[in-house]
Amino acid sequence: PAYNWWNEALHGVARAGTATMFPQAIGLAAMFDEEYLKTVAEVIATEARAKYNMQSAQGDRDIYKGLTLWSPNVNIFRDPRWGRGHETYGEDPYLTSRLGVAFIKGLQGDGEYLKTAACAKHFAVHSGPEGKRHEFDAHASQKDLWETYLPAFEAAVKEAGVESVMGAYNRTNGEPCCGSKTLLKDILRDTWGFEGHVVSDCWAICDFHQTHHV
């Protein structure tokens, strides 16, 4: 049957009926507690799996009903003016890495099969400005790229075995992230050994010619 890949679970299963709502990611990060966050993610995954079982049994495989959860957001919250900073675990790359790993492990479980499929987003250097995200070119030095923006994604791949990675809307150093050979092949696949699937942010492929003009 057809399967819709879009489901959200940043701090609870979203947009698919009643579910437990936990504090936003920035609030959960303030606990500095990896085990507690992993438990939160386990609850989210259990509810997502229960909803999926019920809805698929009824033949409902529409948007927000699947097991590919587009969470966590492991971007770095550098500028308080960024309107989506509350979705992140804050400004520290190390803390974001640790909490991202815990959340992913909680969502995916430790059984033979995935409980749900987590998605580390938005790869990479995606921290505003929100209004220009479809056309913005983020210029990051190699030092800043590897010490600030990539560690959480690297940990998600190498330590947590994240099943999916979402490309960002913006360009990074001239390349649209969702089509970047540097990010998606050289770093993600060849250097880190990622074996899962890559997903674009919503309609980001259209931005290649509509706003990035590449």
PLM region spans:
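Glycoside hydrolase catalytic-domain context in secreted enzymes
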Residues: 1-214
